[in-house]
């Protein structure tokens, strides 16, 4: 599981981007537009997230959809991002966060993922923090890691022991 790349290098892992939710807290905005396609400064939240993933050097994105999935799929096709993006539809009912992640993981042969919520506002300093998190994750052979930020925008890293029975 330990990558052959040296610390400080970006690991060419896969990203999972969670785009299936209803965005209920942003109603009525999200009744006709999925939350990942809402714009800030003429850039969608999803595009901002994908651009960060590309900057990290990741080669493939799994993107789950459910609510207004046709709009997200159309957006991805129209933008023609310079990265492989595989759409994974939740199916007939929404799988929630854990189910969506598990569904995407089943589509990949890789065992390490970086998971993104597109409604997180990523600024330029997060690129460095994500690389630090990856380095810490691999050098310490962790089972999972979570990057957090506080009101002062200083980043924190949370890790936990192995999940029991394979549960998160």
Task: Please report, for each region that a protein language model flagged, where it lies by residue.
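Single conserved hydrophobic/aromatic residue that forms the stacking wall/gate
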Residues: 1-11, 158-168
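N-terminal nucleotide-binding beta1-loop-alpha1 segment
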Residues: 9-31, 56
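Active-site metal-binding loops of divalent metal-dependent hydrolases
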Residues: 22, 119-120
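Short clusters of hydrophobic/aromatic residues that line enzyme substrate/ligand-binding pockets
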Residues: 26-29, 37, 95, 160
């Amino acid at each position: 599981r330990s990558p052959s790349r040296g610390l400080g290098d970006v690991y060419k892992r896969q990203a999972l981007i969670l785009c299936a939710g209803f965005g209920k807290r942003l109603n009525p905005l999200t009744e006709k537009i999925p939350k990942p396609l809402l714009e800030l400064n003429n850039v969608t939240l999803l595009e901002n997230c994908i651009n960060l993933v590309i900057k990290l050097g990741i080669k493939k994105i799994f993107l789950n959809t459910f609510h207004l999935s046709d709009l997200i799929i159309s957006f991805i096709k129209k933008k023609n991002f310079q990265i492989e993006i595989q759409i994974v539809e939740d199916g007939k009912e929404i799988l929630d966060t854990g189910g969506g992640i598990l569904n995407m993981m089943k589509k990949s042969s890789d065992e390490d993922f970086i998971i993104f919520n597109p409604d997180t506002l990523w600024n330029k300093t997060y690129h460095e923090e994500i690389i630090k998190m990856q380095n810490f994750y691999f050098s310490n052979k962790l089972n999972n890691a979570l990057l957090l930020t506080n009101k002062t925008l200083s980043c924190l890293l949370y890790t936990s022991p192995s999940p029991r029975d394979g549960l998160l």
